[in-house]
């Protein structure tokens, strides 16, 4: 009985992230975004056009897109993130991606291929078991959930850009420790799950505005616009148990559907092309496909209860569907600001916002007005980015010391190498 109560307490603590009144699932942190820039943008990631190092976690098809730009990218959280709860819960993530655009070496091969890796964990703090006759600690342990996710994505251009992706997630969970007649035993579970994703990008400016050019004070300015639509289904796998197979719980299988519209202006300064301004709007919706009733566990179809007209166009959430919406604006490829909102599935509104600072635009401007081969080489091949996201959760209102979560990440990008 003690173990069952403890398991329930841990589940409730983690579930302050999202409400799962419609179903009981294990490892709800699997559905959390790990990319800090996308956390800031309303916890989106299904349809955004992102080159962020961990931007493929929700939708592995993103690797087909980002491989057009990144040869290699690495991102990590420099410090752990504290999750407000009744226990000292912390989380941290890091990962990388590598890719190649074959079109750069052969124009007849409009193909990109990328691979990615993500590691993430959720730690519940330190627990101590004491004996009935003495306060001395018999066992000290730290419950933790973690996973390693390996992804593969590919993209192909035929008027539009078509991208597909696949992820294999290997997870481990240490729930508690038990004192048995044969010694101390770990209550733990291991398993695997898969993610599938698709992303279609319609390059509006390439198709219809490619020859539209403005000349202002000697500077050449061109419009840029894309529309993308994405779908992903995450955490397809077997049920998990710690003690009794008859008491196993399903993984949080989730369907995601979304779109992104972005437009901006590129400016030519001498021999350097710089993105002057870029704005994007993202709308996404997701549904937990797991349902439990008196007959057992059931799974909805690949789209669940998602209704595009209601949940994506009108952006109306309900008791089953979570709706994400985000605005992102970038200036001079240097400063990015994102803001978003998340609501639905019986929890209150989550507000997100964040900023990013990149060396990309600043170095391009320096190259435009200076003659330095070393600087030109660094600018053409390397970029550093710092990102910060703030999430305001209103789930427990005033029952927690703070409902704000702060995430930070540092990323390195290597690009434009032709092998």
Task: Name these PLM-found stretches.
Residues 22-419:
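Subset of outer-membrane beta-barrel
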Residues 1-26, 327:
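Bacterial Sec-dependent N-terminal signal peptides
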């Amino acid at each position: 009985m003690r173990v069952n109560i403890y398991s329930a307490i841990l589940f409730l603590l983690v579930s302050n992230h999202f409400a799962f009144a419609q179903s009981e699932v294990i490892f709800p942190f699997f559905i959390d975004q790990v990319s800090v820039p996308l956390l800031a943008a309303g916890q989106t990631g299904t349809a955004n056009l992102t080159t962020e190092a961990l931007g493929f976690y929700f939708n592995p098809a993103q690797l087909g897109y980002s491989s057009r730009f990144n040869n290699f990218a690495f991102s990590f959280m420099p410090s752990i993130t504290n999750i407000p709860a009744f226990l000292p819960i912390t989380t941290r993530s890091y990962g990388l991606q590598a890719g190649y655009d074959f079109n750069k070496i052969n124009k007849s091969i409009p193909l990109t291929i990328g691979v990615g890796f993500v590691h993430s964990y959720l730690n519940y703090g330190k627990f101590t078991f004491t004996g009935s006759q003495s306060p001395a600690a018999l066992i000290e342990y730290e419950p933790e959930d973690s996973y390693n996710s390996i992804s593969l994505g590919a993209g192909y251009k035929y008027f539009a850009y078509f991208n597909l992706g696949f992820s294999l997630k290997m997870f481990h969970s240490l729930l508690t420790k038990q004192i048995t007649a044969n010694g101390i035993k770990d209550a733990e579970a291991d398993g695997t799950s898969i993610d599938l994703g698709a992303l279609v990008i319609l390059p509006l400016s390439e198709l219809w505005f490619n020859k539209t050019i403005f000349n202002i004070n000697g500077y050449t300015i061109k419009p840029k616009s894309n529309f993308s639509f994405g779908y992903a289904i995450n955490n397809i796998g077997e049920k998990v148990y710690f003690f009794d197979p008859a008491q196993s719980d399903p993984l949080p299988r989730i369907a995601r559907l979304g779109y992104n519209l972005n437009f901006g202006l590129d400016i030519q300064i001498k021999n350097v092309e710089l993105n002057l301004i870029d704005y994007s709007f993202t709308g996404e919706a997701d549904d937990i496909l797991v349902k439990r009733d008196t007959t057992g566990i059931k799974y909805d179809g690949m789209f669940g209860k998602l209704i595009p007209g209601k949940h994506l166009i009108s952006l109306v959430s309900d008791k089953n569907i979570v709706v994400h919406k985000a605005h992102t604006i970038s200036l001079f490829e240097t400063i990015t600001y994102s803001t978003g909102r998340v609501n639905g599935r019986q929890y209150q509104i989550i507000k997100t916002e964040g900023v990013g600072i990149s060396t990309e635009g600043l170095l391009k401007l320096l190259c435009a007005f200076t003659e330095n081969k070393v600087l030109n080489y660094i600018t053409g091949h390397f970029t550093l980015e710092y990102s910060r996201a703030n999430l305001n959760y209103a789930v427990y209102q005033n029952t927690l010391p703070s409902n704000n979560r702060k995430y930070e990440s540092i990323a390195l990008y290597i690009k434009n190498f032709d092998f």
